[in-house]
UniProtKB/Swiss-Prot annotation:
InterPro entries given in the database record: Dimethylallyltransferase, IPT, P-loop_NTPase
Name of the coding gene: miaA
Taxonomic lineage of the native organism: Bacteria, Pseudomonadati, Pseudomonadota, Alphaproteobacteria, Acetobacterales
Function text: Catalyzes the transfer of a dimethylallyl group onto the adenine at position 37 in tRNAs that read codons beginning with uridine, leading to the formation of N6-(dimethylallyl)adenosine (i(6)A).
Region feature Interaction with substrate tRNA, mapped onto this chain: 36-39, 160-164
UniProt similarity note: Belongs to the IPP transferase family.
Name of this protein: tRNA dimethylallyltransferase
EC numbers: 2.5.1.75
Cofactor: Mg(2+)
Residue ranges of the TM segments: none
Entry keyword set: ATP-binding, Magnesium, Nucleotide-binding, Transferase, tRNA processing
Length: 319
């Protein structure tokens, strides 16, 4: 049986992945599937530069804005959802195009995770109750007695991961670290190719600053204010998205808007460095199934005719 095919469009934040994935999907008949850990959150369209409604209407888009900010996503959850979206896209005769900069997601999709049993609702409720009653640091201390290997890897303030580790220990009678040491479940039946955008660092820095200004003009502060009134746990993934902590500090009156902008830009730039390091050190697809573009893609038309032809031929040969 012929292997199914999927394409990654990968690169650091603000490199132009979404524009490129959309253009490829339009030209080759694809479905764009989100592989960004923050674009899954419903309330974060502006701050995560999610495709707008007009772009989403041009080709099928999946897994964008599907979780509320109050619900933590995970790589394991995303993997299950992405596999379903890929299968549906392939059955419809469309090329699955996974677009994002979260290297862990790409690695998880291809290589899988250990199969951790569901700890059950009773264990989840206990973890939530203890977290509310004791706070993360005290619950972390209890976890250190029950599952020291996992506790040693967690920060005492990381309430979501501490609660998850506690519920796994209580519900499965085995520590989370022990389950994670089990052999992973790789994804069979799929072949992957990748387009990786790798722009110069200074070009990326300028684009990040410009994007932040554009986000302010488009309502980023209102987006953060809508999160603030929900009084969510600050350790939730959505509350740690680039720009959210910084603009929250501004809205509280702790810092000025220029300082919030500077901090948000610096945090994003540091993140792009970590993304680049991940892609260099853990390549998820290697030549000849990897096509690299060494410039930021502001639009598909920015590519030269030769580059466009070469890239599309690369995809067609794989697909």
């Amino acid at each position: 049986m012929k292997e199914k095919r999927a394409l990654f469009v990968a690169g650091p934040t603000c490199s132009g992945k979404s524009a490129l994935a959309l253009a490829v999907a339009e030209r080759l008949g694809g479905t764009v599937i989100n592989a960004d850990s923050m674009q899954i959150y419903r309330e974060l369209r502006i701050l995560t530069a999610r495709p707008d409604q007009e772009e989403e209407a041009r080709v099928p888009h999946r897994l964008y804005g599907v979780l509320p900010a109050s619900q933590p996503g995970s790589a394991a959850w995303w993997r299950d959802q992405a596999i379903t979206a890929m299968e549906e896209s392939w059955q419809q005769g469309r090329l699955p195009i996974l677009c994002g900069g979260t290297g862990l997601y790409f690695h998880a999709l291809m290589h899988g995770f250990a199969d951790i049993p569901d700890p059950g609702e009773e264990a989840r409720q206990e973890a939530r109750s203890l977290l509310a009653e004791l706070g993360p640091e005290s619950l972390h201390a209890r976890l250190a007695e029950a599952d020291p290997a996992t506790a040693a890897r967690l920060k005492p303030q990381d309430s979501q991961r501490i609660a998850r580790a506690w519920e796994v220990w209580r519900g499965t009678e085995s520590g989370l670290s022990a389950w994670q040491n089990q052999p992973p479940r790789p994804l069979p039946g799929w072949d992957f190719a990748a387009i990786r955008i790798d722009p110069p660092r200074e070009e990326l820095r300028q684009a990040i600053t410009a994007r932040l200004h554009g986000m302010l003009d488009n309502g980023a502060l209102a987006e953060v204010e809508a999160l603030r009134v929900q009084a969510l746990d600050p350790s939730l993934p959505a509350m740690r998205a680039h720009g959210v902590p910084e603009f929250l500090a501004f809205l509280r009156g702790d810092i000025s808007l220029p300082e919030a902008m500077q901090r948000a830009a610096q945090a994003t730039i540091r993140y792009t460095k970590r993304q680049a390091t991940w892609f260099r050190n853990r390549p998820f697809v290697k030549p000849p199934f990897l096509y690299t573009i060494d410039a930021r893609i502001a639009s598909f038309q920015q590519l030269s005719e030769r580059s466009m032809a070469d890239m599309l031929n690369f995809i067609r040969a794989f697909h």
